[in-house]
């Protein structure tokens, strides 16, 4: 069987590379209201650095709104772009706020907890008929994440997480991400295609449904600047 660090390394490696993704973001309130955004996502991940650019394609009243996120060794940084308004930097204290006011935070989108050095296997559990290994990841320093630990339920056959739970320093469960659909990418590797996110807001739930992924793309640093999204 794989050790915790081997499992984390394998998941870290499988997330590396560049991709252009089309995704539907749906935020549902418990009262029944629903908000839907069609997104284009540019993603570039290396062993040490993550760059993301989320851009709203639809509906028209939000078209062109974008969020750019970057994380290297230290804390994550980001920019919020709204047409006809000045570009706004995301403060460190705002990294736990919702991406496009969803239940997924900026930090969740950009951080790669499989690359953290502290990894431990703490048990196993079956999720939706899949026998999973539970991996517990802790950040290298408190500045690297808004979370104190992350638990992920890994399918050891396909090397995809089926569930992710993120905890605060007081041990409170802050966010839970369930993978509801696993698809195959262009290289026939399994990837999480649809996610359901429960966050600190108790009155809403967010779903991401990936529609398309193109991995035959190469981005430059300029692709992750406001000029490229406006």
Describe the predicted segments one by one.
Residues 44-50, 123-131, 185-187:
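Short, ordered beta-strand-loop transition motifs
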Residues 22-28, 57, 136-140:
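Generic short beta-strand segments
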Residues 79, 88-89, 99, 104-108, ...:
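Gly/Pro-enriched, hydrophobic low-complexity segments
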Residues 1-34, 40-49:
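N-terminal leader/targeting segments and the immediate start of mature chains
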Residues 44-104:
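An acidic-aromatic
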Residues 16-20, 36, 49-51, 75, ...:
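Extracytoplasmic
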Residues 9-11, 37-44, 66-70, 123, ...:
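Hydrophobic/aromatic beta-strand elements that line small-molecule binding cavities or substrate pockets
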Residues 2-9, 37, 62-66, 133, ...:
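Charged, amphipathic alpha-helical segments
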């Amino acid at each position: 069987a794989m050790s915790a660090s081997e499992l984390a390394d394998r998941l870290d490696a499988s997330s590396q590379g560049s991709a252009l993704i089309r995704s539907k973001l749906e935020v549902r309130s418990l009262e029944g209201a629903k908000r839907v955004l069609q997104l284009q996502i540019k993603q570039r991940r290396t062993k040490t650095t993550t760059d993301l650019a989320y851009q709203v394609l639809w509906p028209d009243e939000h078209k062109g709104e974008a969020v750019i996120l970057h994380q290297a060794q230290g804390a994550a940084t980001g920019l919020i772009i709204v047409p006809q308004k000045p570009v706004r930097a995301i403060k460190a204290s705002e990294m736990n706020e919702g991406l496009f006011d969803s239940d997924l935070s900026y930090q969740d989108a950009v951080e790669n907890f499989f690359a953290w050095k502290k990894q431990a296997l703490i048990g196993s559990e079956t999720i939706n008929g899949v026998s999973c290994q539970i991996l517990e990841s802790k950040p290298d320093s408190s500045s690297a994440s808004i979370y104190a630990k992350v638990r992920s339920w890994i399918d050891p056959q396909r090397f995809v997480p089926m569930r992710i739970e993120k905890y605060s320093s007081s041990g409170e469960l802050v966010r839970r991400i369930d993978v509801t659909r696993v698809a195959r990418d262009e290289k026939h590797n399994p990837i999480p295609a649809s996610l359901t996110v429960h966050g600190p807001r108790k009155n809403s739930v967010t779903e991401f449904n990936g529609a398309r992924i193109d991995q035959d793309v190469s981005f430059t640093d300029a692709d992750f600047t406001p000029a490229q999204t406006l």
